[in-house]
Amino acid sequence: QDTIPVQLTTDGEPNYTFNREDEGKLEGRFGAESTHWIPGSHRFYAVREDNRKVRDLWLINSLSTPYPTLKTYKAELAGDKHVTQYELLIGDVDTREVKKIDINRWPDQYIDILYISKDGKRLYFQRYNRPWNQSDICEVDVETGKVRVVIHEENKPYLDYQMRNVSFLNDGKEILFRSERNGWGHYYLYDTATGNLKNQLTDGIWVAGPVTKIDTIGRKMYFYGYGREKGIDPYYYILYEAQLDRPNAVRLLTPENASHDVSISPSYRYMVDSYSTVSQEPVNVVRNRNGKVIMTLEKPDLQPVYEMGWKAPERFKVKAADGVTDLYGVMWKPADFDSTKVYPIISNVYPGSFFEYVPTRFTINDVYNTRLAQLGFIVITVGHRGGTPMRGKAYHTYGYNNMRDYPLADDKYAIEQLAARYPFIDATKVGIYGHSGGGFMSAAAICTYPDFYSAAVSSAGNHDNRI
């Protein structure tokens, strides 16, 4: 029977299919195929998209021969009445039954498949409402199709998707869950069977970031954190250890004031740590499980680079336009920099809100900034309120409902402070440039402050976020 194709469904049609039609479609969420086997069983699950009511958009291929051709595709725009509808189905190849699971809670919700138990009896998914301020982590009984909510999360104005983490431990018996519910990104451990919170693993006025490794036998997790240690730049990746069975039992493992990139051995006994700053060359060490350095490894020989005139950029700190919030940035100078001269300044920008283009680690040429400085400019990139979840919820969500203007005043005020601090900056010759969201921001900046910015370069700017 394995060699004979068997059709299990008959209701497919264009834009309502189990196997996405990638041609002419925007990048999807589930890949080219949305059907997957459930481990250890004769069942499969499928995520089906219904795009039949989603608006059509069009492209004209003017290079097509012998004449231009029209391409029609489906695309959701902000505020559209009709958007993609998602379905979860479980099929049985023995009974040839395909069952639609009742996953709906909110109109126009979006779903992610998270985990399937090793015995194939339980499937977990996460659903979000359309405003993206509520979500459920749900368990599906594969046999019966019954859905149970394990964790409900609600956070306004919106949930942080960029740094979200949902990890299933001990074959799904526990769930490690990251939340900004107290205003700061922290980790919580739940009992999956009951949905009860077992422990809040991290807490405080700082941000717990990406998890690098989880030791389920030793009952520890290893993760990067930001802003916990006084005197350390809040953008630097600092490695910590937390106990799974004790609340807020957090231990610092990499104390140096630098950004760390750590690889932990399979035994959890050792870790290789490469740490640096924009002006400090990488230091590569081996640490034991307590964070103690037990060996220093090789380091790069950059003397030829310095002999060619290369100069490391400098990190700086200024205030936001509110006069209270600290902002961090990086400054590049020409190789032949002369402090007695005056230089025009260019701000390389990206508004976020999931990422700030403010490097923290050592690099010889950070995109175009080093090269641009050699043309006789002071080049900076500086963070701003609304730019990243690494600084906490209030900082991250500052730009909500103000997509165009929220970063502009901070960029302008940062440049004004630097010009007042450094006589070599000419505040009458200010340029701004960026790509994508940065292109959007640079165009908005010169239109909003035409007497401050002298020139703007906008690359592929998304100037109307309604489309």
Regions of interest found by a model, annotated:
Residues 1-5, 31-55, 139-141, 275-277, ...:
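Internal hydrophobic scaffold segments of catalytic domains
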Residues 3-13, 99-102, 147-152, 198-203, ...:
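Beta-propeller fold detector
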Residues 2-3, 92-96, 142-145, 192-195, ...:
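Short loop/turn segments that connect beta-strands within beta-propeller blades
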Residues 130-132, 157-159, 230-233, 278, ...:
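Short glycine/serine/proline-enriched coil/turn segments at secondary-structure junctions
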Residues 54-59, 85-87, 132-139, 183-188, ...:
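Structural motif
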Residues 14-44, 72-80, 84-87, 104-128, ...:
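Conserved beta-propeller blade repeats
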Residues 56, 126, 261-467:
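Serine-hydrolase catalytic core recognition
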Residues 5-36, 45-100, 290-305, 357-368:
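Predominantly five- to eight-bladed beta-propeller fold
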